[in-house]
Amino acid sequence: MADVGGGVMNVTFEPCCRNNWHIHHKQVQVLICVAGRGWYQEWGKAPVEMTPGTVIAIPAEVKHWHGAQKNSWFQHLTYHKDVQEGAGNEWCEPVDDDTYNALK
């Protein structure tokens, strides 16, 4: 993991908690679900359920969000790899309640 930028982080979401849509510029984000149940979704694509053991590598420049399911805590490890000069995050609009509440 020599190319990991910023180290590994442990992130916990309470039920119904999710982050805004966001983009990781010039870096790949890796999510590893370690507990609970969550969601991952790329802009314009169907949501993906995350359960313990699910690993998702998010390519640079892909707009996405992730967070807990309505009735479950969600914990994931995350790190960035292939980090290039000028890498950063762009935070976008919230995931609207209607979209989130329609997830099953």
Predicted ranges, named:
Residues D3, G7, W65-K104:
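Double-stranded beta-helix
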Residues N10, V55, W65:
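Short, surface-exposed charged micro-motifs
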Residues T12, T51-T54, T78, T99:
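Residue-identity detector for threonine
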Residues M9-V11, L31, L77:
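Conserved hydrophobic/aromatic positions in well-ordered beta-strands
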Residues M1-W21, Q27:
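A short glycine-rich, His/Asp/Glu-containing loop-to-beta-strand
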Residues R18, I23-T54, V62:
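A short beta-strand-loop-beta hairpin characteristic of the jelly-roll/cupin
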